[in-house]
């Protein structure tokens, strides 16, 4: 699997993470059962599928090599986020708050995983972040450094954006929904889960 990484394309941003959950019950003995969890992250569903196929072949080959058996239990992970630029109504709201901002670009790839990725395949989602803190996200040194910037301005931004979306009988909100082209609807999303995350022997 280490050598397999050489086949990944840079633009796919593939990441593999292995965790050995069980490796036998006694020392100095070949285990009767070993359990490993492999996590795949990538920039698209296609890249995840292609990587998963390579991983499956690697495990199949290793299992065949020592005459063992393999049982797979696919686990559902987050789907990659589809980039969507800031709507004019949000930009208008930021400017009313006299705040500075930078619009993200598709090239600003973030390897973090979030359930927002699933939502972007179904709805017009705008994922934004804000300041007012220091340290590593989810880290022991994370701390709030500016309460106005961390709490108050984001709340005002959301309230103003909602107002701008709903004014004039929700004209802007309806326009965004009308122009959005989802990857899945509810039924096809559920079918994707069933097709890709059922047990395989």
Predicted segments with their positions:
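Charged catalytic carboxylate motif
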Residues: 54, 89, 153, 157
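Midchain, well-structured core segments that form catalytic/ion-binding scaffolds
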Residues: 1-88, 94, 107-117
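Sequence-level detector for tyrosine residue identity
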Residues: 35, 59, 64, 78, ...
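Zn-dependent metallopeptidase/amidohydrolase metal-coordination segment
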Residues: 103-201
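Surface-exposed helix-capping loop/turn segments at secondary-structure junctions
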Residues: 8-12, 66-70, 101-102, 166-174
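Short, flexible segments with low predicted structural confidence
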Residues: 90-92, 129-130
């Amino acid at each position: 699997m280490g050598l397999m990484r050489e086949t990944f394309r840079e633009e796919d941003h593939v990441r593999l993470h292995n965790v050995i959950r069980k490796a036998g019950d006694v020392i100095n003995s070949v285990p009767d059962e070993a359990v490993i969890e492999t996590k795949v992250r990538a920039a698209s569903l296609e890249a995840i599928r292609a990587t998963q196929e390579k991983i499956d072949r690697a495990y199949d080959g290793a299992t065949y090599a020592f005459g063992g058996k393999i049982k797979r239990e696919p686990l559902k992970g987050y789907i990659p986020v589809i980039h969507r630029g800031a709507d004019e109504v949000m930009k208008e709201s930021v400017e009313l708050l006299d705040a500075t901002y930078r619009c993200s670009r598709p090239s600003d790839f973030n390897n973090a995983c979030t359930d927002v990725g699933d939502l972007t395949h179904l709805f017009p989602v705008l994922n934004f972040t804000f300041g007012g803190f220091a340290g590593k996200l989810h880290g022991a040194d994370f701390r709030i450094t500016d309460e106005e910037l961390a709490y108050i301005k984001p709340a005002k931004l959301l309230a103003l954006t909602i107002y701008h979306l709903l004014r004039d009988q929700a004209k802007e909100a309806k326009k965004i929904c009308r122009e959005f082209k989802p990857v899945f609807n509810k039924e096809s999303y559920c079918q994707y889960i069933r097709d890709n995350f059922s047990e395989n022997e």
